[in-house]
């Protein structure tokens, strides 16, 4: 017999994903890795089953617990992949390539053009992905380059090739947004180079563009390092809290042991006092019984000594017969 093919379930809806993220935000101290140190497996399992019940309440098809866990793992993987793209772009100075979800091409993707250096492609997170990023504690740095307006070169009739000048009305600026987990602290750094004089050689303009890109990359790198340090500090604080809780529990156990030892010492003292009282009572009883025992011994000795001198009646009769016979 042919085995019937398994029917594929429907994909998770937006409402189901929203419920999963909401429940994990509420129960992050039980289910998120850098919060749930020391949580027993029974509590984690109960929390996951609670999420499964809420998902099945709105789902069109019945979900199983492994499916919900797999969906949460996929969401985390997608968010971490985008954050890794930004980190690689900032640390390596290269723009992340296009992805299947972001599209094969478009503005802001690919390598940089011109002499101003490579530009960091923007990585935009949806509000749901931003919530997951905050929940995971990943620090994101999203660079949004602004538009640039450069007017064409204006040359007069008397201008020569050596004295060629350009008129620049707006210099490209780059604004960097930094988002940190659990604040949620958002701050923006914008750096605009100083305006150039109306008549500036083309070579000086190119050099100025190169120098303006480097400080911005340094600022982005510093912001990323500070975000990492803050995250490490939070993890360290969590470990310190756990150690403090363990120390408090050990102190409570030591106090309980000391109390039990004190109770045992009190019980031993009471037993010793009871033994002393018993010994005193026995000594008094012995002292009282000694004269009575002596009197009883004397009485017994007197009773055994009195019947010895009395004469035997048979001997008296025998002695009387000869007397009668003699008479």
From Swiss-Prot:
Composition skew (Gly residues), residue ranges: 104-118
- Ranges for the region named Disordered are 87-118, 303-327
State where composition is biased (Polar residues): 316-327
Q: Name one GO cellular component term.
A: mitochondrion
Give any single GO term for biological process.
regulation of mitochondrial membrane permeability involved in apoptotic process
Q: Where is this region: Required for nuclear localization and apoptosis-inducing activity?
A: 1-70
Question: What tissues harbor this protein?
Answer: Widely expressed.
Superkingdom in the source lineage: Eukaryota
Quote the InterPro entries the UniProt record gives. Answer: Myb_DNA-bind_5
- Indicate where this protein resides in the cell: Nucleus
Keyword terms, alphabetized: Apoptosis, Nucleus
Q: Where is the composition biased (Low complexity)?
A: 87-98
Q: Which family does it belong to?
A: Belongs to the NAIF1 family.
- Subunit structure and binding partners: Interacts with HARBI1.
Question: What function is annotated for this protein?
Answer: Induces apoptosis.
Q: What is this protein called?
A: Nuclear apoptosis-inducing factor 1
Query: In the UniProt record, what gene is named as encoding this protein?
Result: NAIF1
């Amino acid at each position: 017999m042919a085995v019937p093919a398994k029917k594929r379930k429907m994909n998770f809806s937006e409402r189901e994903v929203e419920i999963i993220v909401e429940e994990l935000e509420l129960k992050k101290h039980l289910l998120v890795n850098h919060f749930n140190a020391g949580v027993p497996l029974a509590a984690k399992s109960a929390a996951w089953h609670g999420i499964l019940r809420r998902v099945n309440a709105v789902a069109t098809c019945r979900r199983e617990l492994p499916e919900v866990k797999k969906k949460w793992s996929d969401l985390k993987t997608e968010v971490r992949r985008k954050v890794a793209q930004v980190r690689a772009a900032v640390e390596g100075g290269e723009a992340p390539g296009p992805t299947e979800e972001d599209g094969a091409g478009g503005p802001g993707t690919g390598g940089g053009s011109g002499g101003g250096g490579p530009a960091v492609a923007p990585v935009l997170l949806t509000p749901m992905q931003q919530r997951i990023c905050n929940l995971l504690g990943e620090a994101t740095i999203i660079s949004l380059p602004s538009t640039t307006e450069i007017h064409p070169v204006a040359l007069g009739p008397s201008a020569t090739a050596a004295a060629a000048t350009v008129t620049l009305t707006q210099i490209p600026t780059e604004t960097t947004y930094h988002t940190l987990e659990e604040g949620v602290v958002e701050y923006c750094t914008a750096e605009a180079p100083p305006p150039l004089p109306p008549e500036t050689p083309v070579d000086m303009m190119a050099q100025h563009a190169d120098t303006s890109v480097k400080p911005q990359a340094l600022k982005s790198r510093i912001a990323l390092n500070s975000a990492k340090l803050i995250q490490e500090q939070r993890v360290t604080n969590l470990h310190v809290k756990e150690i403090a809780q363990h120390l408090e529990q050990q102190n409570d156990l030591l106090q309980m042991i000391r109390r039990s030892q004190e109770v045992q010492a009190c019980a031993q003292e009471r037993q010793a006092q009871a033994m002393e009282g018993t010994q005193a009572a026995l000594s008094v009883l012995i002292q009282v019984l000694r004269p009575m025992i002596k009197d009883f011994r004397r009485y017994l000795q007197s009773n055994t000594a009195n019947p010895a001198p009395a004469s035997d009646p048979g001997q008296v009769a025998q002695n009387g017969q000869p007397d009668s016979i003699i008479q």
